[in-house]
Amino acid sequence: MKPIKNTITYSICLSMSLLSQTFAQETTVLDEIKVSTENSNYSTQNDNYYKTKSQSATKTDTPIRETPQSVQVVSNEIIKELNAVKIEDVLDYTSGVSRQNNFAGMWDNFSIRGFAGNENTGMSLLKNGFADNRGFNAPRDTANIESIEFLKGPSGSLYGNSEPGGTINIVTKQPKFTSEHSIKTDVGSYDFYRMALDSTAPINDNLAYRLNVATEKKGSFRDDIESQRYVVAPSLLYSINDDTFVSYMGEFIEQKAPFDRGIALIDGKNVMNPKNFLGNPDDGDVTLKNQTHQLKLEHYFSDSWSSRMGVAYKNNSLKGFGSEVTPSTKITTDNINLRTRYRDYSSDDIQFQADLQNVTDIKDATNTLLFGVETYRFEQDSILYTNKDTVRVDNIRSNPTYTVLKTGLGSLSTDKYEEQKGVALFVQDEVAYKDFRFLTGLRYDEVRMDNVNHLDSSSVKQNDYAVSPRVGITYLIDDMWSVYTTSGTSFRPNTGTDIDGKTFEPEKSVSIETGLKFESEDKKTGGTLSLYQIQKKNVLMTDPNDPDEKRAAGKVRSKGIEFDFNGKITDNIKANFNYTYTDAKVVEDSTYEGNELLNIPKHTSSVLLMWEDSLSLNSSYGIGTGITYVGRKAGNVNNDFYLPDYTTAKIVSYYKVNKELNFSLNIDNLFDKEYIASSYDRSWLTVGNPRTATLSMTYKF
């Protein structure tokens, strides 16, 4: 086996050589690309409620109906309809997605089909096809999001290091060669204030820009919680000629918020007042800063050949104090001592991608061949100070009071450096023959990890290798209906060490799925019914001997049924409906066998209905309702308590005065239902938001 450094260097040189040789060939002008760039990442066709294509499902132009995989796309229209400002605001309206431990509100963390990934990195998440979940990321803001793609099932043959339940790909807004500008303001309950700018225009005939800016300040129904958020996202699109495009996407996010683990169980059954803050108000804010840069080159050599190349860089940091109940603490009285931790985490992530695509017609068949290379290097420094019994909270059931017992950083409990290097080669072949669509894919991954513990000057090295195949078949029954079946594998390196300092084996999984798809002839509505089963081994779970440590479970299994439908049913009615049944549990383990996976309800469902009508030539209105149901779910890995089911409702409405001015009013949790959204264990319960109202105004110019 060649050293990974040499493999990375060779792969990059090979890709550069292939591209440079092909650039020298005579190219064919593709007029349709010049008009809409529909086959590239820069399509401006973003106004559809229902999406017929996904950028990331196959990395090709294959329609969703012909893809042997369940794919749901939340369009920008749905994002605006829900007045979503973070991606968690839309996840209730997609099947198979459940909330997980969000690290005291510091990041996004959700599971798909029962699998949440590493809790120190969160779910499998991409941004424009680049990995976006390594390091500590602030909750993603929708200010520069065009759509959110949910790729169900394993994506290991294309994306390698991913979860078998599915992957989320965020598609950011792209520059346009038309002038469009808007300012949006939001005012809402609990001192919520937000302003966002979206501006795009051509700089000249070949260069266009887009700038998204957002600033947000909000309070909370919970005591002593206020937060701020700032987003700046510039992007550029340069059309070198009709065949060649260069794009840049930048994103700068800063979030300041208190470290809030939520509430806790008292006597194992009574929940605290959801307004009470179980922390130290004097800790101040935890500050997260993320900056992302992506540069892509896309070239069409001819009608048959095209290629993409890209590089991405991301820097993350998290700093601040946070006081919390020690996990798994059993609270039996009205007072509790907290521990205080100071965290100083920083990371750098650089990635390179290149692929080459060929489309060939052979008699009755069309063959689409894709092959490429990916490399990355990720580094993270983690410093953690722990000070025990620093704050005593009294009267936690009613009116908490806080007494500081100790100050200072405490002892240095973690000081480590982690480095990951990865390289991958992948190939995918799609064959369209009459009414059949065949897909095969294969990816080879090589990952090297170095973990250095500065506390005892020890280091642990780990090398992982994986081959991830995928096969799938789709049969087009007629112009609207299709059936598919697919199977694939995925792998994900487990970072860190166990309580004895030993590294973990990588997670490996096998998945099988079959389904039925529908798409109306006018392409305005569509739906998917899917059945799946996934088995996965070496999943990290809480060590029963130390809640701050992890151990690898033997094997877990998830199986279920999902149904999604959305689109514009009539000229006046739009609908989004989904239902999920998930049976996810540990099937082999010395401690947890038979237990349900954390925060995974067996049943979830949601519906969003919207009525729209015109009032005059340029004036219109819309009003609708959304209802979500989340079933009972395990509150910790031991399954010794469960979170009850809940149903919430919301009202969405807007009034479009004219082409320039629009007002909207959204009311969430209409009936003010109290519920627990997720938990980590009995001492960390995340409280759902009560009834809130938000009034928004958008002005286009």
Regions found by a protein language model. Name each.
Residues 17, 31-178, 183, 514:
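Acidic, small-polar-rich N-terminal luminal/periplasmic segments of exported/outer-membrane proteins
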Residues 121, 134, 143-146, 157-234, ...:
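Outer-membrane beta-barrel translocator/receptor signature
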Residues 237-241, 347, 366-370, 374-378, ...:
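Structural signature of Gram-negative outer-membrane beta-barrels, strongest in the C-terminal barrel
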Residues 298-300, 306-312, 316-322, 506-568, ...:
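Membrane-embedded beta-barrel scaffold of Gram-negative outer-membrane proteins
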Residues 533, 552-637, 671-672, 700:
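Gram-negative outer-membrane beta-barrel transporters
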Residues 575, 628-636, 654-701:
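C-terminal beta-signal and adjacent terminal beta-strands/loops
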